[in-house]
Amino acid sequence: MKTRITELLNIDYPIFQGGMAWVADGDLAGAVSKAGGLGIIGGGNAPKEVVKANIDKIKSLTDKPFGVNIMLLSPFVEDIVDLVIEEEVKVVTTGAGNPSKYMERFHEAGITVIPVVPSVALAKRMEKIGADAVIAEGMEAGGHIGKLTTMTLVRQVAAAVSIPVIAAGGIADGEGAAAGFMLGAEAVQVGTRFVVAKESNAHPNYKAKILKARDIDTTISAQHFGHAVRAIKNQLTRDFEKAEKDAFKQENPDLEIFEQMGAGALAKAVVHGDVDGGSVMAGQIAGLVSKEETAEEILKDLYYGAAKKIQEEASRWAGVVRND
C-alpha cells in the first residue's frame, strides 16, 4: 500500500514512531527504520552531542530514512538545526514552536519538514510556510497535548489542508491505525506502544507502568497553569493536582512552581525508574498495550492489522450505493 507519505519518505510502512524525549533514542528509532517504518529520534532538550550520538547509532544500524524531532523551545535548537543539516537527516518533525525561521535552510538541505499541530489553524499556517506534511496529534496522546481529540482533529485538518496528514494520539493497534486512515490520514504516528518495544531503553519500571495501565489510568496535569501533560497517575500527578487547586484559590498564583515540579520529571521516570515521583508520560491507549515486542513485530501488527480491518469493513459496505 502506497500513500504520499510512503512515497515522499521512501518507507515501507506508513507508520511513524513518535519522537519521544528520553525514550526515542538511536536504538529504538534505528530498529523502527530498519524494519521499514520511520524511526524518529526525540531531541527534547538534549544538547548536540547527545543527538549526534543517537544519529550515529541509527546510521550504524541501517541506511534507511529516519527523522529527528526538534523541540523549538530547546536551549540547543540552533545547534540541533545545524546538526541535522550537517548529518543529512532526511526528515525533521517539530514541536513547541514555529519552524518558519528554519524552513528555508531545511528545504535547501533536502530535509522533509513535518510539524506536529494541535489545531486546524496551526495546520493551515504550517502549510502556508512550506511544511511538507503535518502530524495532527489529538489529546489522547501522552506527553504535551492540545485540546482536541484525534477523531475531531485529524478529520478537520485533512479537510483543511492539501499536504499529507499523519494521525497521532491514541493509536496502538491495527484498528486504531485503520481509523486514522479512514479519517483522511496518509500515515499514523505511534508513541506509547513503542515505549515498551524490546529495543526501547526506557527503564523497566516505566515499561511496567504502561503494561499494567488500564483505560482510566492516565490524567492531565497543568492544563490550567502551564503546558498540559498527559501521564499515568502517580504521586507526581497528585502533587500537580493539589498545586492547581491551591493556585485557583490565589489571586496571583506563582506559576513558577509548575515549571519547578516538571523539571527533570520525565528523565527521572524514563532513565532512573522513579515512576512515583517522575512523569510517566503515556497515552490513553496504554490500556491496550499489554506486551513487549520487537519494533518489527509492532510495525507488522499495525500495518497488517489495519489492512485486515479496512478489508473487512470494505466487504461489509460493498454494494452500498446511493441512488437518489
Regions found by a protein language model. Give the residues of each.
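Active-site entrance/lid segments in N-terminal catalytic domains of soluble metabolic enzymes
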Residues: 1-160, 164
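Active-site metal-binding loops of divalent metal-dependent hydrolases
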Residues: 20, 170-171
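Conserved acidic functional residues
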Residues: 116, 169-170
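Conserved active-site-proximal phosphate/metal-binding subdomains
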Residues: 151-162, 166, 172-324
